[in-house]
Each structure stands twice: as C-alpha cells, then as structure tokens.
C-alpha cells in the first residue's frame, strides 16, 4: 500500500556546518579521547590526496595579524567583565566561543570539536561551545560564478536549466543552492566558499606553531597538542575535497545494499558530471525528518523497519566494512516517499581499520560467547593505551561486572546511554584512551537509541527474527574466524 504523501514532505539537503553544535552533541559518550571531525585509522591514500598547500609567509603573516587583532578584542571584552562576580576562569571561557566565531571557519570547526568532546576539554568549556553556530552571509555572486568557470568551465546559467542564486544554506566552508539540470532533474549544488582553502591553510599553519609552543608545558604534552592539531588539519583538508565526500557516500551505501537489511537505506545520487573538488551536485530529495515521529506515522511508514535500518547501517558499516556515517543527528536523516531512510552529509565518516575490526570481533566473542573476561581485558589493552595497570584478576572481575548485564537482558531493553556511562567509568578507572573511531561509533548508537524511543518504543530488538538472524550469522562468522586462528 502506498503511503499518502502530505505537506510534511519537503525538499531537503543539509551539510553539517549549517547546524549548531548543540544539536550534534546532545549525547555524551566520552571516554577520554576527543572525537575529531573524521575518524580514519590506517588509511593514508585520501590523506595524501587531501593535503593543503603551504601558504606564502606574507599570507600567514596577514592571518597572524588578524588573529592577534581578534585576540586583543577578546582581551578588551574580558577586562570589561572583570568587575563582575565570579571566577576569572569562567569569564575567560564565556568569551572564547565568540572569539572563535570572529576568527573564522578553521576556529569554528575546532570549536565544534570542543563542544562534542567534554571528556578531553572539560564540561564547562564544552558547554559554552555548544551554542557556537557556523552561519555566515553568502559569498558574492560574481565570486561564485568565477568558481563555476574554474571548476566546470562555464557559468551556472549555462550549465543548468535553472540555478537559484540565493543559497538556502550558507556556512563558512560551503553554501548550497537549488538547481535544475537540462534533463529536468532537480538537484542541490554544494559550493565551496571562494578563497577558503588559502585561509584555512594559513590558520592551520598558525595552529601548528601554537601547538609546538603549548607542548613546552606539561599539560600541552599530556594532551598531545601537536598530534591533535595535525589530525585536525588532515581532517579539515579532507573536508575541503568534495570528491572524497561523494566517494565515501557511494562506497558506504554499496556495502549496505549487499544485504536485505539495506533495502530501506539510500543516499542522494551524485551527478559526477557536475562534481569537482569544490563543487558537489546531488539529486534533490524530498522527505520527512527522522525525529518527526507524528508525520512518519501519519504517512503510514513502519518505525520498526526504519530503526532496524539505522542499527544495521552502524553495525554492518562499522564492524564489518569499517566505514560508517559519523554524524547521525536528525538533520542528516530523512524518510523519503517510499519509506526509506535517506542519509545526508557525508563530510563526517568513521573509518575503522581491519586490525581494529578484528579486535572488536574478538572482544565480542570473548565477552558474549566465551565469557572469558581475562581475554577481553587483554584485547582492550591491544585496542588502546591503558594508563593504569591493575592485577589481571581484578581487571577480569571489573570487566565481568560490566559484561554480565549485557548477557542477561535483551538488547531491546538496554540503554546505550547507561552502557556508555558504565564503560566511561570503567575507562576512567584504568585511564584507557580508546581509539577515537570507537568513541565516534558509540555516539552513533546513542543517536539510534533516541530514534528507537521515538519511532519504535515497544520494539524488542532481540525478539526480531530478521535482526536475530543477522546477529547469529555475525557471531558464527566470529566463531569461525576464531577457530581458524587457533588452527593456524
């Protein structure tokens, strides 16, 4: 039966910059490692492609001057706050988000990382940055037209049957326009802001110099400031190549469509003839936002099927193929007129390398099949840096206390938030710094839990024959892998 499409369906395309950090970071799954914009472990090919060129010294000097001016303005505002009551540290913290906004896109991106990583930067600082928005006025029309000529060889009026000059979303890295192809297909066109690459490159050079200075102090060395900035620079450079976003999107969905559980998942079609490093053209999709439960029910769609598709996307993508969507907030998930979930904005992708995937499968096998908590503890040590070593018997008991409830209740009754808090406490006790990829995938499960409560509150996941079959097959594969390793 075809669902009736009402006024709740609307055209949609989004990219993460247009959403406040508060919406992205409504869940808190923090162990001890910050979550950077993309998680990419063991993959160097894209990193090599996405490196930004070093800017000339005069350009860097100009950005240093601009940065110094903004810092001076912050100091003046801070001095004005001093007569007020309250600790001076809190007064400084309250000034920082506005300073980051004034400094521009690179610092706004870094501010969004602070907002989503209270475990690394502290709750009070993180809380202040959650209101940081990345919305700026659109670029000048003539600059946009020049970019089209440079990237696609002609102006938008000649490339498209129609092109809306006014973008419907505008942020520091890119802006997005509606357009229509000559073939009649409606599309959205994401355009990189002219000149942004050089500005970001200059800012990153400044941040790298600053990180070198910060590491002269003990706190800077403990936070690995240079590594943090280097990783941030790689990820931001990758975000500036729209071809990588399009490739990630297509690779991800092709993995999922290989299984029947992937039938309710789709992504916008990329129009490669109109896609380059700085222009990304995709089909325009109409749909209902995933957290609009009333509209989804009114349209006649099955909330259980939608939640199953979301869970499958994280499990199959992350644990089997090592590629998962890294930002499942509601603005990136819509339900189309066929009842499929449309995933948007693949600027944030999580990548888990084969070794870590193997360790994760071994951890699942040790905890849930063999109930060998000592073996599980050794696997955790292999997965991350354990700062506090304890006797093996005590570590095994601590893991057993954590894992036993997982084996005694159905997953449908579990709270991923509670599991996250317990795991966080366990990690704190041992000073475990798990790979950021695992922290990132944990956040996606918390988003899914929220949608589960909205769309399928009475659904028992482990009573569902389709999912139990999927997990049973997964565990059989893990057992076979384990057995073959023993035989070898």
Swiss-Prot record:
**CDD domains, per database record:** ABC1_ADCK3-like
GO CC annotation terms, alphabetical: cytosol; peptidoglycan-based cell wall; plasma membrane
Where do transmembrane segments lie in this chain? none
A GO MF annotation of the entry reads: ATP binding
Q: Which InterPro entries match?
A: ABC1_dom, Kinase-like_dom_sf, Prot_kinase_dom, UbiB_kinase
Q: Which domain of life is it from?
A: Bacteria
In terms of PANTHER family, this protein maps to: CHAPERONE-ACTIVITY OF BC1 COMPLEX CABC1 -RELATED, PROTEIN ACTIVITY OF BC1 COMPLEX KINASE 7, CHLOROPLASTIC
Protein family:
Belongs to the protein kinase superfamily. ADCK protein kinase family.
Specify the protein name: Uncharacterized protein Rv0647c
